[in-house]
Amino acid sequence: MNPAVFLSLADLRCSLLLLVTSIFTPITAEIASLDSENIDEILNNADVALVNFYADWCRFSQMLHPIFEEASDVIKEEYPDKNQVVFARVDCDQHSDIAQRYRISKYPTLKLFRNGMMMKREYRGQRSVKALADYIRQQKSNPVHEIQSLDEVTNLDRSKRNIIGYFEQKDSENYRVFERVASILHDDCAFLSAFGDLSKPERYNGDNVIYKPPGRSAPDMVYLGSMTNFDVTYNWIQDKCVPLVREITFENGEELTEEGLPFLILFHMKDDTESLEIFQNEVARQLISEKGTINFLHADCDKFRHPLLHIQKTPADCPVIAIDSFRHMYVFGDFKDVLIPGKLKQFVFDLHSGKLHREFHHGPDPTDTAPGEQDQDVASSPPESSFQKLAPSEYRYTLLRDRDEL
Protein backbone atom coordinates (compact mmCIF):
# COMPACT_ATOMS: atom_id res chain seq x y z
CA MET A 1 0.00 0.00 0.00
CA ASN A 2 1.44 3.36 -1.01
CA PRO A 3 2.05 5.75 1.84
CA ALA A 4 -0.34 8.69 1.93
CA VAL A 5 1.06 12.01 0.78
CA PHE A 6 0.09 14.94 2.91
CA LEU A 7 0.47 18.62 1.89
CA SER A 8 0.62 21.35 4.41
CA LEU A 9 -1.93 24.17 4.12
CA ALA A 10 0.85 26.56 3.08
CA ASP A 11 2.04 24.19 0.32
CA LEU A 12 -1.51 23.79 -0.95
CA ARG A 13 -2.04 27.55 -1.14
CA CYS A 14 1.24 27.99 -3.00
CA SER A 15 0.31 25.30 -5.54
CA LEU A 16 -3.09 26.86 -6.16
CA LEU A 17 -1.52 30.30 -6.60
CA LEU A 18 0.92 28.97 -9.20
CA LEU A 19 -1.90 27.22 -11.05
CA VAL A 20 -4.13 30.31 -11.13
CA THR A 21 -1.22 32.52 -12.20
CA SER A 22 -0.32 30.21 -15.08
CA ILE A 23 -3.93 30.21 -16.29
CA PHE A 24 -4.77 33.91 -16.05
CA THR A 25 -1.48 35.69 -16.71
CA PRO A 26 -1.64 37.03 -20.30
CA ILE A 27 1.17 36.20 -22.65
CA THR A 28 3.38 39.23 -23.16
CA ALA A 29 3.84 40.01 -26.83
CA GLU A 30 7.45 40.42 -27.85
CA ILE A 31 8.38 43.61 -29.66
CA ALA A 32 10.42 42.64 -32.73
CA SER A 33 13.76 44.44 -32.82
CA LEU A 34 14.56 45.17 -36.45
CA ASP A 35 18.00 45.27 -38.02
CA SER A 36 19.39 45.11 -41.54
CA GLU A 37 19.33 41.30 -41.43
CA ASN A 38 15.67 40.74 -40.49
CA ILE A 39 13.73 43.89 -41.35
CA ASP A 40 12.59 42.89 -44.84
CA GLU A 41 11.57 39.38 -43.85
CA ILE A 42 9.57 40.50 -40.80
CA LEU A 43 7.80 43.40 -42.53
CA ASN A 44 7.10 41.53 -45.77
CA ASN A 45 5.38 38.71 -43.87
CA ALA A 46 3.24 41.00 -41.71
CA ASP A 47 -0.26 41.99 -42.80
CA VAL A 48 0.11 45.14 -40.69
CA ALA A 49 3.23 46.30 -38.85
CA LEU A 50 3.62 49.33 -36.59
CA VAL A 51 7.28 50.27 -36.26
CA ASN A 52 8.68 52.56 -33.58
CA PHE A 53 11.81 54.38 -34.75
CA TYR A 54 13.47 55.60 -31.57
CA ALA A 55 16.67 56.59 -29.79
CA ASP A 56 17.44 55.62 -26.20
CA TRP A 57 18.61 59.12 -25.26
CA CYS A 58 15.31 60.69 -26.45
CA ARG A 59 12.97 61.30 -23.49
CA PHE A 60 9.88 61.02 -25.69
CA SER A 61 11.09 57.62 -26.87
CA GLN A 62 11.62 56.56 -23.26
CA MET A 63 8.08 57.63 -22.35
CA LEU A 64 6.61 55.72 -25.31
CA HIS A 65 8.33 52.35 -24.66
CA PRO A 66 5.99 50.99 -21.92
CA ILE A 67 2.90 52.32 -23.73
CA PHE A 68 3.98 50.71 -27.00
CA GLU A 69 4.64 47.39 -25.26
CA GLU A 70 1.29 47.38 -23.46
CA ALA A 71 -0.57 48.24 -26.68
CA SER A 72 1.22 45.32 -28.32
CA ASP A 73 0.00 43.01 -25.54
CA VAL A 74 -3.60 44.20 -25.98
CA ILE A 75 -3.54 43.71 -29.76
CA LYS A 76 -1.81 40.33 -29.52
CA GLU A 77 -4.78 38.96 -27.58
CA GLU A 78 -7.14 40.09 -30.35
CA TYR A 79 -4.90 39.04 -33.26
CA PRO A 80 -2.90 36.04 -31.99
CA ASP A 81 -1.50 35.06 -35.40
CA LYS A 82 2.03 36.49 -35.35
CA ASN A 83 1.75 37.68 -38.96
CA GLN A 84 -1.60 39.48 -38.55
CA VAL A 85 -0.15 42.40 -36.61
CA VAL A 86 3.49 43.03 -35.73
CA PHE A 87 4.75 45.64 -33.28
CA ALA A 88 8.41 46.33 -34.01
CA ARG A 89 11.09 48.87 -33.21
CA VAL A 90 14.33 50.22 -34.64
CA ASP A 91 17.13 51.67 -32.51
CA CYS A 92 18.14 54.43 -34.91
CA ASP A 93 21.50 55.03 -33.23
CA GLN A 94 22.44 51.38 -33.68
CA HIS A 95 20.92 51.12 -37.16
CA SER A 96 21.42 54.51 -38.80
CA ASP A 97 21.24 52.87 -42.24
CA ILE A 98 17.60 51.91 -41.59
CA ALA A 99 16.83 55.39 -40.23
CA GLN A 100 18.23 56.93 -43.41
CA ARG A 101 16.35 54.44 -45.58
CA TYR A 102 13.04 55.62 -44.10
CA ARG A 103 14.10 59.28 -43.76
CA ILE A 104 13.61 59.50 -40.02
CA SER A 105 13.92 63.13 -38.92
CA LYS A 106 12.45 62.99 -35.42
CA TYR A 107 12.09 60.63 -32.47
CA PRO A 108 9.92 58.76 -31.87
CA THR A 109 8.45 58.18 -35.33
CA LEU A 110 5.72 55.55 -35.71
CA LYS A 111 5.35 54.23 -39.25
CA LEU A 112 2.78 51.77 -40.56
CA PHE A 113 3.63 49.01 -43.04
CA ARG A 114 1.35 46.67 -45.01
CA ASN A 115 2.99 43.54 -46.40
CA GLY A 116 6.32 45.35 -46.35
CA MET A 117 5.03 48.52 -48.03
CA MET A 118 5.42 51.67 -45.95
CA MET A 119 2.28 53.78 -45.77
CA LYS A 120 2.63 57.45 -46.56
CA ARG A 121 0.80 58.53 -43.41
CA GLU A 122 2.58 57.77 -40.17
CA TYR A 123 0.85 57.56 -36.80
CA ARG A 124 0.60 61.05 -35.28
CA GLY A 125 -2.18 60.47 -32.77
CA GLN A 126 -2.26 60.30 -29.00
CA ARG A 127 0.43 58.20 -27.36
CA SER A 128 -1.75 56.03 -25.18
CA VAL A 129 -2.48 52.31 -25.08
CA LYS A 130 -6.11 52.84 -26.08
CA ALA A 131 -5.29 55.20 -28.96
CA LEU A 132 -2.64 52.88 -30.40
CA ALA A 133 -4.88 49.82 -30.05
CA ASP A 134 -7.82 51.64 -31.66
CA TYR A 135 -5.56 52.73 -34.51
CA ILE A 136 -4.52 49.14 -35.23
CA ARG A 137 -8.12 47.92 -35.02
CA GLN A 138 -9.06 50.57 -37.57
CA GLN A 139 -6.23 49.46 -39.86
CA LYS A 140 -7.43 45.85 -39.59
CA SER A 141 -11.05 46.69 -40.40
CA ASN A 142 -12.42 45.96 -43.87
CA PRO A 143 -11.45 48.89 -46.13
CA VAL A 144 -14.15 48.07 -48.70
CA HIS A 145 -17.87 48.60 -48.14
CA GLU A 146 -19.93 45.88 -49.82
CA ILE A 147 -23.06 47.42 -51.31
CA GLN A 148 -26.36 45.56 -51.11
CA SER A 149 -28.25 47.60 -53.70
CA LEU A 150 -27.23 49.67 -56.72
CA ASP A 151 -29.31 52.46 -55.18
CA GLU A 152 -26.37 52.97 -52.84
CA VAL A 153 -24.30 53.99 -55.86
CA THR A 154 -26.96 56.46 -56.96
CA ASN A 155 -27.02 58.02 -53.49
CA LEU A 156 -23.27 58.21 -52.96
CA ASP A 157 -21.73 61.13 -51.09
CA ARG A 158 -20.35 62.96 -54.13
CA SER A 159 -18.25 65.29 -52.01
CA LYS A 160 -15.85 62.33 -51.70
CA ARG A 161 -13.73 60.45 -54.19
CA ASN A 162 -15.34 57.05 -54.73
CA ILE A 163 -13.82 53.90 -56.21
CA ILE A 164 -16.34 51.16 -57.03
CA GLY A 165 -15.41 47.62 -58.00
CA TYR A 166 -17.89 45.30 -59.72
CA PHE A 167 -16.83 41.64 -59.50
CA GLU A 168 -18.31 38.30 -60.45
CA GLN A 169 -16.82 36.62 -57.38
CA LYS A 170 -15.42 37.81 -54.08
CA ASP A 171 -13.02 34.88 -53.99
CA SER A 172 -10.99 36.02 -56.99
CA GLU A 173 -7.56 37.46 -57.72
CA ASN A 174 -9.20 40.57 -59.19
CA TYR A 175 -10.90 41.38 -55.91
CA ARG A 176 -7.85 40.50 -53.80
CA VAL A 177 -5.80 43.09 -55.69
CA PHE A 178 -8.62 45.63 -55.36
CA GLU A 179 -8.89 45.00 -51.61
CA ARG A 180 -5.14 45.32 -51.16
CA VAL A 181 -5.12 48.69 -52.93
CA ALA A 182 -8.08 49.80 -50.80
CA SER A 183 -6.23 48.88 -47.60
CA ILE A 184 -3.50 51.35 -48.59
CA LEU A 185 -5.61 54.21 -49.97
CA HIS A 186 -8.76 54.02 -47.83
CA ASP A 187 -7.90 57.35 -46.15
CA ASP A 188 -7.96 59.08 -49.54
CA CYS A 189 -10.96 57.45 -51.23
CA ALA A 190 -14.13 55.61 -50.31
CA PHE A 191 -13.98 52.04 -51.67
CA LEU A 192 -17.13 50.06 -52.49
CA SER A 193 -17.75 46.69 -54.10
CA ALA A 194 -20.59 44.62 -55.55
CA PHE A 195 -20.64 40.93 -56.47
CA GLY A 196 -22.57 38.36 -58.47
CA ASP A 197 -25.97 39.20 -59.93
CA LEU A 198 -26.01 42.60 -58.22
CA SER A 199 -22.90 43.69 -60.12
CA LYS A 200 -23.85 42.06 -63.44
CA PRO A 201 -25.25 45.23 -65.12
CA GLU A 202 -21.83 46.89 -64.67
CA ARG A 203 -19.80 43.87 -65.85
CA TYR A 204 -20.64 43.89 -69.54
CA ASN A 205 -16.94 43.33 -70.38
CA GLY A 206 -15.95 41.44 -67.25
CA ASP A 207 -14.98 42.71 -63.80
CA ASN A 208 -14.93 46.48 -63.70
CA VAL A 209 -13.51 49.31 -61.57
CA ILE A 210 -14.95 52.81 -61.81
CA TYR A 211 -13.81 56.11 -60.31
CA LYS A 212 -16.49 58.64 -59.41
CA PRO A 213 -14.87 62.03 -58.77
CA PRO A 214 -16.38 64.68 -56.49
CA GLY A 215 -19.32 66.59 -57.93
CA ARG A 216 -22.54 65.34 -59.48
CA SER A 217 -21.63 66.63 -62.93
CA ALA A 218 -18.14 65.09 -63.02
CA PRO A 219 -17.95 62.16 -65.48
CA ASP A 220 -16.99 58.67 -64.32
CA MET A 221 -13.63 57.18 -65.29
CA VAL A 222 -13.18 53.47 -66.06
CA TYR A 223 -10.03 51.50 -65.26
CA LEU A 224 -8.77 49.79 -68.41
CA GLY A 225 -5.62 48.13 -67.08
CA SER A 226 -4.94 44.62 -65.82
CA MET A 227 -7.10 43.79 -62.80
CA THR A 228 -4.52 41.33 -61.46
CA ASN A 229 -1.50 43.65 -61.77
CA PHE A 230 -1.16 45.30 -58.36
CA ASP A 231 1.32 48.01 -59.40
CA VAL A 232 -0.72 49.15 -62.40
CA THR A 233 -3.99 49.08 -60.45
CA TYR A 234 -2.46 50.89 -57.47
CA ASN A 235 -0.89 53.64 -59.61
CA TRP A 236 -4.16 54.30 -61.45
CA ILE A 237 -6.26 54.46 -58.29
CA GLN A 238 -3.67 56.52 -56.41
CA ASP A 239 -3.67 59.05 -59.24
CA LYS A 240 -7.43 59.42 -58.79
CA CYS A 241 -7.51 59.36 -54.98
CA VAL A 242 -4.62 61.72 -54.23
CA PRO A 243 -5.39 64.98 -56.05
CA LEU A 244 -2.72 67.25 -57.50
CA VAL A 245 -4.08 70.09 -55.35
CA ARG A 246 -4.68 68.85 -51.81
CA GLU A 247 -6.56 70.56 -49.00
CA ILE A 248 -4.49 71.56 -45.99
CA THR A 249 -6.18 71.32 -42.59
CA PHE A 250 -4.98 71.51 -39.01
CA GLU A 251 -5.23 67.71 -38.94
CA ASN A 252 -2.84 67.06 -41.86
CA GLY A 253 -0.70 70.19 -41.57
CA GLU A 254 2.10 68.46 -39.67
CA GLU A 255 2.26 65.69 -42.27
CA LEU A 256 2.40 68.16 -45.16
CA THR A 257 5.05 70.40 -43.62
CA GLU A 258 7.22 67.37 -42.91
CA GLU A 259 7.34 66.60 -46.63
CA GLY A 260 9.76 69.53 -46.74
CA LEU A 261 8.43 71.14 -49.92
CA PRO A 262 7.32 74.79 -50.14
CA PHE A 263 3.57 75.43 -50.32
CA LEU A 264 1.73 77.07 -53.20
CA ILE A 265 -1.61 77.79 -51.54
CA LEU A 266 -4.97 79.03 -52.70
CA PHE A 267 -6.91 80.60 -49.83
CA HIS A 268 -10.60 80.51 -50.72
CA MET A 269 -13.99 80.53 -49.05
CA LYS A 270 -15.29 77.03 -48.48
CA ASP A 271 -18.24 77.47 -50.85
CA ASP A 272 -16.13 79.14 -53.55
CA THR A 273 -15.66 76.09 -55.73
CA GLU A 274 -15.23 78.17 -58.89
CA SER A 275 -11.91 79.71 -57.77
CA LEU A 276 -10.71 76.29 -56.63
CA GLU A 277 -11.53 74.76 -60.00
CA ILE A 278 -9.70 77.56 -61.82
CA PHE A 279 -6.66 77.10 -59.58
CA GLN A 280 -6.68 73.31 -60.05
CA ASN A 281 -6.89 73.65 -63.82
CA GLU A 282 -4.05 76.18 -64.00
CA VAL A 283 -1.81 74.13 -61.71
CA ALA A 284 -2.40 71.10 -63.94
CA ARG A 285 -1.80 73.17 -67.08
CA GLN A 286 1.24 75.19 -65.97
CA LEU A 287 2.91 73.36 -63.11
CA ILE A 288 2.57 69.60 -63.53
CA SER A 289 6.35 69.37 -64.06
CA GLU A 290 6.91 71.02 -60.65
CA LYS A 291 5.03 68.33 -58.71
CA GLY A 292 8.15 67.09 -56.94
CA THR A 293 9.44 70.56 -55.99
CA ILE A 294 6.42 72.25 -54.42
CA ASN A 295 3.15 71.21 -52.76
CA PHE A 296 -0.05 72.48 -54.37
CA LEU A 297 -2.64 73.16 -51.67
CA HIS A 298 -5.89 74.93 -50.96
CA ALA A 299 -7.06 76.24 -47.60
CA ASP A 300 -10.29 77.49 -46.05
CA CYS A 301 -10.01 81.27 -45.56
CA ASP A 302 -12.08 81.21 -42.38
CA LYS A 303 -10.00 78.47 -40.76
CA PHE A 304 -6.66 79.96 -41.78
CA ARG A 305 -7.21 83.60 -40.88
CA HIS A 306 -3.84 83.86 -39.13
CA PRO A 307 -1.70 83.09 -42.22
CA LEU A 308 -3.82 85.59 -44.14
CA LEU A 309 -3.12 88.27 -41.54
CA HIS A 310 0.57 87.48 -41.97
CA ILE A 311 0.32 88.67 -45.56
CA GLN A 312 -2.00 91.56 -44.64
CA LYS A 313 -5.11 89.90 -46.03
CA THR A 314 -8.49 88.93 -44.58
CA PRO A 315 -11.15 86.43 -45.71
CA ALA A 316 -12.83 89.33 -47.50
CA ASP A 317 -9.81 89.44 -49.85
CA CYS A 318 -10.13 85.80 -50.86
CA PRO A 319 -9.37 84.15 -53.22
CA VAL A 320 -5.67 84.76 -52.55
CA ILE A 321 -2.67 82.80 -53.85
CA ALA A 322 0.57 82.73 -51.86
CA ILE A 323 3.78 80.76 -51.48
CA ASP A 324 5.09 79.73 -48.07
CA SER A 325 8.75 78.73 -48.32
CA PHE A 326 8.94 77.91 -44.57
CA ARG A 327 11.08 81.03 -44.23
CA HIS A 328 8.84 83.67 -45.75
CA MET A 329 5.45 84.10 -47.40
CA TYR A 330 5.05 85.68 -50.84
CA VAL A 331 1.78 86.87 -52.35
CA PHE A 332 0.78 86.30 -55.97
CA GLY A 333 -0.77 89.33 -57.67
CA ASP A 334 -4.45 89.60 -58.53
CA PHE A 335 -6.10 86.18 -58.53
CA LYS A 336 -7.45 86.83 -62.04
CA ASP A 337 -3.86 86.93 -63.31
CA VAL A 338 -3.65 83.17 -62.75
CA LEU A 339 -5.41 82.83 -66.11
CA ILE A 340 -2.56 84.62 -67.91
CA PRO A 341 -0.53 81.86 -69.62
CA GLY A 342 2.71 81.19 -67.74
CA LYS A 343 2.04 83.72 -64.96
CA LEU A 344 1.63 81.15 -62.17
CA LYS A 345 4.56 79.14 -63.51
CA GLN A 346 6.80 82.22 -63.41
CA PHE A 347 5.76 82.87 -59.80
CA VAL A 348 6.99 79.41 -58.81
CA PHE A 349 10.17 79.75 -60.91
CA ASP A 350 10.91 83.05 -59.16
CA LEU A 351 10.76 81.20 -55.85
CA HIS A 352 13.23 78.54 -56.99
CA SER A 353 15.62 81.08 -58.52
CA GLY A 354 15.64 83.17 -55.35
CA LYS A 355 14.12 86.15 -57.12
CA LEU A 356 11.14 86.44 -54.76
CA HIS A 357 13.39 86.51 -51.71
CA ARG A 358 15.90 88.85 -53.35
CA GLU A 359 13.30 91.37 -54.48
CA PHE A 360 11.61 91.46 -51.11
CA HIS A 361 14.90 92.50 -49.53
CA HIS A 362 16.44 94.63 -52.27
CA GLY A 363 13.61 95.75 -54.54
CA PRO A 364 13.02 94.78 -58.19
CA ASP A 365 15.89 93.32 -60.18
CA PRO A 366 17.46 95.86 -62.59
CA THR A 367 16.17 93.87 -65.56
CA ASP A 368 12.61 94.40 -64.30
CA THR A 369 12.91 98.20 -64.57
CA ALA A 370 11.63 99.69 -67.82
CA PRO A 371 14.13 101.71 -69.93
CA GLY A 372 14.29 105.32 -68.71
CA GLU A 373 12.37 104.47 -65.55
CA GLN A 374 14.11 105.35 -62.31
CA ASP A 375 14.59 102.57 -59.77
CA GLN A 376 12.40 102.92 -56.73
CA ASP A 377 13.48 101.78 -53.32
CA VAL A 378 10.77 99.31 -52.50
CA ALA A 379 12.88 96.89 -50.53
CA SER A 380 10.98 95.31 -47.67
CA SER A 381 11.04 92.43 -45.26
CA PRO A 382 8.77 89.58 -46.38
CA PRO A 383 6.35 88.14 -43.81
CA GLU A 384 7.73 85.18 -41.91
CA SER A 385 6.42 81.72 -42.68
CA SER A 386 3.14 80.94 -40.99
CA PHE A 387 2.78 77.26 -41.87
CA GLN A 388 6.11 76.29 -40.32
CA LYS A 389 4.23 76.49 -37.02
CA LEU A 390 2.33 73.34 -38.08
CA ALA A 391 5.57 71.34 -38.26
CA PRO A 392 6.31 68.60 -35.67
CA SER A 393 6.47 70.13 -32.21
CA GLU A 394 9.50 70.02 -29.93
CA TYR A 395 7.04 69.23 -27.13
CA ARG A 396 6.20 65.86 -28.74
CA TYR A 397 9.38 64.93 -30.59
CA THR A 398 13.13 65.23 -30.49
CA LEU A 399 13.83 66.91 -33.81
CA LEU A 400 17.11 65.78 -35.32
CA ARG A 401 17.97 69.22 -36.66
CA ASP A 402 17.77 70.53 -33.09
CA ARG A 403 20.17 67.84 -31.86
CA ASP A 404 22.55 68.51 -34.74
CA GLU A 405 22.76 72.15 -33.66
CA LEU A 406 23.81 71.24 -30.08
From Swiss-Prot:
Widely expressed. Residues 30-138 form the Thioredoxin domain. Mediates thiol-dependent retention in the early secretory pathway, forming mixed disulfides with substrate proteins through its conserved CRFS motif. Inhibits the calcium channel activity of ITPR1. May have a role in the control of oxidative protein folding in the endoplasmic reticulum. Required to retain ERO1A and ERO1B in the endoplasmic reticulum. InterPro entries: ERP44, ERp44_PDI_b, Thioredoxin-like_sf, Thioredoxin_domain. GO terms for cellular component: cell surface; endoplasmic reticulum lumen; endoplasmic reticulum membrane; endoplasmic reticulum-Golgi intermediate compartment. The keyword ATP-binding does not apply. Residues 1-29 form the signal peptide. Disulfide bonds join 189-241, 301-318. This is Endoplasmic reticulum resident protein 44. The keyword Transmembrane does not apply. Its main location: endoplasmic reticulum. A motif (Prevents secretion from ER) lies at residues 403-406. Pfam families: Thioredoxin, Thioredoxin_6. It is found in: Endoplasmic reticulum lumen. SUPFAM superfamilies: Thioredoxin-like. Residues 236-285 are annotated as: Interaction with ITPR1. Residues 360-387 are annotated as: Disordered. Forms mixed disulfides with both ERO1A and ERO1B and cargo folding intermediates; the interactions with ERO1A and ERO1B result in their retention in the endoplasmic reticulum. Directly interacts with ITPR1 in a pH-, redox state- and calcium-dependent manner, but not with ITPR2 or ITPR3. The strength of this interaction inversely correlates with calcium concentration. Residues 377-387 have a biased composition (Polar residues).
